[in-house]
Amino acid sequence: MSRGLGDVYKRQLFEETPEIEARMMLKGVLNKGQEDVALNDIVVGRAGALRIIHFNIYVNGELLNSYQADGVIISTPTGSTGYNLSAGGPIVEPTASMIVVTPICSHALNTRSIVLSAEDEIVVEIGKGRDNRTEIAAVSFDGEQTIEIYTGDQIVIRRAEDTTKLFKLSKISFLETLRKKMKGS
């Protein structure tokens, strides 16, 4: 009788001591009082009409930049290999303590991702649209819960107090996995 991969993982999980990795999460609090957490990312993106949105990003109370873009991805290291990577953001080792800010299709030539300390507080504030129109945007937590926000609304994003604990059943390192993905296998 052959043993499947599931049997190997069951044995590692229940008979051996599996390695446990703690992964940081983000907490987002809207000025409307709504809040949620995300393991991968919090995305502020356009909603409604298919036009760029205007928004400001503050880090620890200081203006980082004003953007005209399709949105912005605020990512954890775990989420850096998902939407963040697709938008041109950096790959971050998943157990690192940092936050990545990546604009989505910015209407500027010099816009790049920024890597911040996990202790920084980020505020995304929705600005006024063209001709002083009210902007409509959407906030998404790990692509799940989506909340509409409007001109003047803010979301405060910081490291969550809780972490996600993952059982590491494979002995394959992050770098080996990354190397295989970069080769297309």
Regions found by a protein language model. Give the residues of each.
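Single conserved hydrophobic/aromatic residue that forms the stacking wall/gate
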Residues: 1-9
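Charged, amphipathic alpha-helical segments
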Residues: 10-13, 40
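Mid-sequence acidic-hydrophobic segments that form the walls
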Residues: 12-16, 45
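ATP/pyrophosphate-binding catalytic subdomain of soluble kinases
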Residues: 22-110, 118-120, 179-184
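ATP/nucleoside-binding phosphotransfer catalytic cores, i.e., glycine-rich phosphate-binding loops
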Residues: 44, 49, 60-63, 112-185
